[in-house]
């Protein structure tokens, strides 16, 4: 589950790169995606907690104003699952209401994931795990939930950590 989303629509590639750089430097957010809407018009999507998304959008808007034009910006706290699907891209074969089949936590997935989580003190969200391994979000969520139910992980909010 994504904690919060920040969307920033700008005119110009230079403004978009400048805004993305400023957003990532200003707050603890992750660039989830970007969309080129028209030639020269781009939308940047960041993920993080709500305060971080707001700070990132403030910094990104200021940077984009210096080199281009800001069309619009929006923060979305605790987005609905269908909204997450919409932001994640339309290329998924499943519809947002369908559940992906459970993917068992195979030993090689589990070992690699546990090693990664051991190196990240604050834990990781399913979205961060999916981005790191190049997995679909549902697969990452299923593997994390399987390890959580097996007692290997603890969960606080949307973050998974190694159980001490």
UniProtKB/Swiss-Prot annotation:
Cell location: Bacterial microcompartment
CDD domains, sorted: BMC_CcmK_like (cd07045)
Family under the similarity heading: Belongs to the bacterial microcompartments protein family.
InterPro entries, alphabetized: Bact_microcomp_CS, BMC_dom, BMC_shell, CcmK-like_sf, CcmK/CsoS1_BMC, EutK_C, WH-like_DNA-bd_sf
Main localisation: other
Note: The need for a bacterial microcompartment in EA metabolism can be bypassed by increasing the levels of EAL and an acetaldehyde dehydrogenase (not necessarily EutE).
Ranges where the EutK-Ctail domain occurs: 108-164
Keywords, in A-Z order: Bacterial microcompartment, Virulence
Disruption phenotype: Not required for aerobic growth on ethanolamine (EA) supplemented with cobalamin (vitamin B12). A double eutL-eutK strain grows as well as wild-type on EA and cyanocobalamin, but a quadruple eutL-eutK eutM-eutN strain does not grow. A non-polar deletion mutant grows on EA at pH 5.5 to pH 7.0 but not at pH 8.0 or pH 8.5, releases increased amounts of acetaldehyde on EA plus vitamin B12. Preventing acetaldehyde vapor loss allow growth up to pH 8.5.
A biological process from GO: generation of precursor metabolites and energy
Span of domain BMC: 4-88
A single GO cellular-component term on record: ethanolamine degradation polyhedral organelle
Protein name per its UniProtKB record: Bacterial microcompartment shell protein EutK
Domain of life of the native organism: Bacteria
Induction: Part of the 17-gene eut operon transcribed from a single promoter, induced by ethanolamine and adenosylcobalamin (AdoCbl, vitamin B12).
Biotechnology: Artificial BMCs can be made in E.coli by expressing eutK, eutL, eutM, eutN, eutS (eutSMNLK) or eutS alone. Cargo proteins can be targeted to them and beta-galactosidase (lacZ) was active within the BMC, showing the BMC allows passage of substrate into the interior. This can lead to the development of tailored BMCs for specific metabolic reactions. The addition of eutQ to the eutSMNLK construct results in biogenesis of multiple BMCs.
Quaternary state and interactors: Monomeric in solution.
Pathway recorded for this protein: Amine and polyamine degradation; ethanolamine degradation
Role played: A component of the bacterial microcompartment (BMC) shell dedicated to ethanolamine degradation. Expression of eutK, eutL, eutM, eutN, eutS (eutSMNLK) in E.coli leads to formation of a single BMC. Coexpression of eutQ with eutSMNLK permits E.coli to make cells with more than one mobile BMC, as is usual in vivo.
Pfam families registered for this protein in UniProt: BMC, EutK_C
